[in-house]
Amino acid sequence: MEPVSIRTKNPGAMWPGPVATKFGSTEWIPCGGNNKCAVFSTFEQGAAAQFYLWATKYTQMTLADAIHKWSGHNSSPEYAAFMAKRIPSLTMDTVMTVAFLKSENGWRFMKAQSQWEAGKPYPMTDDQWRRGQEIAFGRAAIPPPPDIEPIPEPVPTKSIWQALIEFIISLFRRK
């Protein structure tokens, strides 16, 4: 079975909440322990939520402090080292900024984070990461939810007697 962050199209394995809702999440599933994972319709929406959450809650912190907060203090030194190894410009003391998140290294950072969360490479293309970044920072619109066929209203059926009575009445109506 695929990791929950892949099944939910939630690359950061983020919890449900206002940010997840802003980017289209309408439900969540349990994802181990007492954790919850927001569910997204597209990978780009999940990525956009991840970028936005980092931009609003994890900037002006060092990489080490931001990962410590993000992970709920779970394996944070290893997690931060994993991230720093994949983005050459990062060190444990790098202060996370919105400018960094908007940059080419910003989406590479999110891509690395998704790999840590999934435990394997995340199934998103670089173009999907860029699109998520554009959505998060207002350079692209949030895609509409996938079309769902409306359930047709039931059509009332008439009994044979009701139809016969209506027919007979119609014979006596004046035209």
Language model regions located:
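Cell-wall polysaccharide-cleaving catalytic domain and substrate-binding groove, primarily
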Residues: M1-K175
